[in-house]
Amino acid sequence: MSGFTLSDLERIVDERSKAPPEESWTAKLCAAGQPKAAKKLGEEAIEAVMAAVTGDRDNLTYEAADLLYHLMVVLKIAGIPLQNVMGELERRTAQSGLQEKASR
């Protein structure tokens, strides 16, 4: 099992976002702004869904990695740290999904 974490990915996205856009895809996406990054996130989500529906496990793994990466870029542009997302997940898992949904 890999020791690589989402926190590692967040750090890498942060570092690469500071590079010149012509040298880094991450920097290029960040420079293009949230509409471009969010569109790319949506494209990757669709590709992951298609891989899941067709049962292509290898492609689903590949597309899930793309999806997580692009989500981290969108969060970076929005100024939302991964810790905030993890905190929300922790809050939600403290109760059943049905209870959480009813509380909205």
Curated annotation (Swiss-Prot):
Keywords: Amino-acid biosynthesis, ATP-binding, Cytoplasm, Histidine biosynthesis, Hydrolase, Nucleotide-binding. The keyword Hydrolase applies. Its main location: cytoplasm. It holds the Pfam family PRA-PH. It comes from the Bacteria. One of its GO terms (molecular function) is ATP binding. It is found in: Cytoplasm. Pathway: Amino-acid biosynthesis; L-histidine biosynthesis; L-histidine from 5-phospho-alpha-D-ribose 1-diphosphate: step 2/9. Transmembrane segments: none annotated. One of its GO terms (cellular component) is cytoplasm. GO terms for biological process: L-histidine biosynthetic process. CDD domains: NTP-PPase_HisIE_like. It catalyses: 1-(5-phospho-beta-D-ribosyl)-ATP + H2O = 1-(5-phospho-beta-D-ribosyl)-5'-AMP + diphosphate + H(+). Belongs to the PRA-PH family. PANTHER family: HISTIDINE BIOSYNTHESIS BIFUNCTIONAL PROTEIN (PTHR42945), HISTIDINE BIOSYNTHESIS BIFUNCTIONAL PROTEIN HIS7 (PTHR42945:SF1). This is Phosphoribosyl-ATP pyrophosphatase.
